[in-house]
Curated annotation (Swiss-Prot):
Family, similarity comment: Belongs to the ABC transporter superfamily. Lipid exporter (TC 3.A.1.106) family.
Subcellular localization, as worded in the UniProt entry: Cell inner membrane
Domain spans labelled ABC transmembrane type-1: 32-315
Enzyme superclass (EC): translocase
Transmembrane segments: 31-51, 68-88, 145-165, 166-186, 259-279
Keywords: ATP-binding, Cell inner membrane, Cell membrane, Lipid transport, Membrane, Nucleotide-binding, Translocase, Transmembrane, Transmembrane helix, Transport
Protein name from the UniProt record: ATP-dependent lipid A-core flippase
Pfam families per the UniProt record, alphabetical: ABC_membrane (PF00664), ABC_tran (PF00005)
GO cellular component term, pick one: plasma membrane
Source organism per UniProt: Haemophilus influenzae (strain ATCC 51907 / DSM 11121 / KW20 / Rd)
Length: 587
């Protein structure tokens, strides 16, 4: 069985960006427009600096007032150009990043929906929520914010180099010596940022998981006075995240001054060389020197920005790696092509053995039984004996590696997954309802397939109509997340109505009434009997009174069938079933 834990591959920044590029490519028009705007923005900035030479040498140096008046309009025009191009570049890149993040989230969401149950057994909900929300948003930093900075500041530095080289190539050569040193420094810092960013994202997942755990289990926390335990746990993970965040800040804060010091050394060198006779006598005017010196001063800002954006870009790339690690995992195997519309419902287990991932002990050991179409088999036994595992295998929530499970004589692995699950309806102890209307919950995933009359008929058969009609908007009432506004019995009846509407030939009742009180159980027992009619039923029961009429009862213990027969014959055997029966009915 394939391991489904998240393991991030150590790809380089370039390799990761190459994988991200297919998501960016459909929106490359926005990148091109933004790139052109950023180039013009950089030219406007460097052009303003270059204007210092004619202003000083020709305007003020020669007292040319008409020239100075003309230059005033030129400066205003360049500043307007700078503002327009800045807006265009920011808007286009924000549009691109929004599209990329949306695409990634949609791919991730769709991929997660097709992952096997074993994947969710091994990865916490909080961590996965963090991946979809926090990590996917981090991609915006690498596809928008950081790209704006990289392109704009990169173009600005190149244009400043061009201005300096055109004005005085001798002084500009100094920067060609210092440049590679800064590049090497940025490369070294990139690796540090990448590692720290991965650690920070892991901490965010743990923080989300801790929060989600407390919110979902809030009643348990209150009941057992676990506030201190949860507070200590949350304080630990939040402090761990704070420490990792401070490491990022420290690395960023150290890298900036180092780059600034190296750049200032280049500036001081230029200032010193300008005083030497070789350059001073080479027609270096006040305007030319001012342009070179101002260009070098102006270059400090983009150099600092490029160093700072490196941390942002590496965070985005680390987030991409994490998300690609999920997308690289294989979804549920769905190699079958057989379709039964509908199946007759004959179910058979042949020598089935199964173990959960990461466990050596078998959950099921050589299980064999058959259920003729339209008959009911009940599974009873202690908690952890393997009853629910059998139910999960019928719907292929887990795949077996030994034995066969047949539906109408066909191996369930030969069925198309969608068709297999269309032929099986599950009503479990843990009912999940969606934050939607009553009608949409009953007709979940098939709202267009069923009419309102069919939905009402299913609700009536499930004995749910009596409470639905009392709701403010009746079937159009939104019931809140997981049906929080409903009682346990009401939620269970909606689950039964959902199964009735689906009308599948195979029905699995996984302790469907064990969480209810006796009165609620009695209220829905008639609904369950209606649901069982003309169906092959697998019942997992805690209360033996609910399965006395089953055609066959299997007593499961430690993953094996210990006893089998109907209620009467099992009582006569005076074995494990008789012992369970005596415990429930005689105390």
């Amino acid at each position: 069985m394939q391991e489904q834990k998240l393991q991030e591959n150590d790809f380089s920044t370039l390799q990761t960006f190459k994988r991200l590029w297919p998501m960016i490519k459909p929106f490359k028009a926005g990148l091109i427009v933004s790139g052109v705007a950023l180039v013009f923005n950089a030219l406007a900035d460097s052009g303003l600096i270059y204007l210092l030479k004619p202003l000083l040498d020709d305007g003020f140096g020669k007292a040319n007032h008409s020239f100075l008046k003309m230059m005033a309009f030129v400066v205003v025009g360049m500043i307007i150009l700078r503002g327009i191009t800045n807006f265009i570049s920011n808007y286009c890149l924000a549009w691109v990043s929004g599209k990329v993040v949306m695409t990634m989230r949609r791919r991730l969401f769709k991929h997660l929906m097709f992952m096997p149950v074993s994947f969710f057994d091994q990865n916490s909900t909080g961590r996965l929520l963090s991946r979809i929300t926090y990590d996917s948003q981090m991609i915006a930093s690498s596809s928008s914010g950081s790209l704006i900075t990289i392109v704009r500041e990169g173009a600005y530095i190149i244009s400043l180099f061009a201005v300096m080289f055109y004005t005085s190539w001798e002084l500009t050569i100094v920067l060609f010596i210092i440049g590679p040193i800064i590049a090497v420094l940025i490369r070294l810092v990139s690796k540090i940022f990448r590692r720290l960013s991965k650690n920070l994202q892991d901490s965010m997942g743990e923080l989300t998981s801790a929060t989600e755990q407390m919110l979902k289990g809030h009643k348990v926390v209150l009941s057992f006075g676990g506030q201190h335990v949860e507070e200590v746990h949350f304080n630990h993970v939040s402090n761990d995240m704070r420490r990792k965040s401070m490491k990022m800040v420290t690395a960023n804060s150290i890298s900036d001054p180092v780059v600034q010091v190296i750049a200032s050394l280049a500036l001081a060198t230029v200032l010193y060389l300008a005083t030497t006779p070789l350059i001073a006598e080479d027609n270096l005017s006040a305007g030319s020197f001012t342009v070179v010196f101002s260009s070098m001063l102006a270059m400090m800002r983009p150099l600092k920005s490029l160093t700072a954006v490196n941390a942002q870009f590496q965070s985005g790339m680390a987030a991409c790696q994490t998300l690609f690690a999920i997308l690289d995992l294989e979804p549920e195997k769905d190699d079958g092509a057989y379709k039964a519309e509908p199946a007759k419902g004959e179910l058979e287990f042949k020598n089935v053995s199964f173990a959960y991932q990461g466990k050596d002990e078998l959950a099921l050991n050589n299980i064999s039984f058959s259920v003729p179409a339209g008959k009911t088999v009940a599974l009873v036994g202690r908690s952890g004996s393997g009853k629910s595992t059998i139910a999960n295998l019928v719907t292929r929530f887990y795949d077996i590696e030994q034995g066969e499970i047949l539906l109408d004589g066909v191996n369930i692995q030969d069925y198309r997954l969608s068709n297999l699950r269309e032929n099986c309806a599950v009503v479990s102890q843990q009912v999940h309802l969606f934050n939607d209307t009553i009608a949409n919950n009953i007709a979940y995933a098939a709202q267009d397939k069923y009419s309102r009359e069919e939905i009402i008929a299913a609700a009536k058969a499930a004995y749910a109509l009596e409470f639905i009609e009392k709701l403010p908007q009746v079937f159009d009432t939104v019931i809140g997340e997981n049906g929080t506004s409903l009682s346990g019995g009401q939620r269970q009846r909606l689950a039964i109505a959902r199964a009735l509407l689906r009308n599948s030939p195979v029905l699995i009742l996984d302790e469907a009434t064990s969480a209810l009180d006796t009165e609620s159980e009695r209220a829905i027992q008639s609904a369950l009997e209606e649901l069982k009619k003309d169906r092959t039923v697998v019942v997992i029961a805690h209360r033996l009174s609910t399965i006395e009429n089953a055609d066959e009862i299997l007593v499961i213990d430690h993953g094996e069938i210990r006893e089998r027969g109907n209620h009467k014959t099992l009582l006569e055997q005076n074995g494990a079933y008789k012992q369970l029966h005596s415990m429930q009915f005689t105390g």
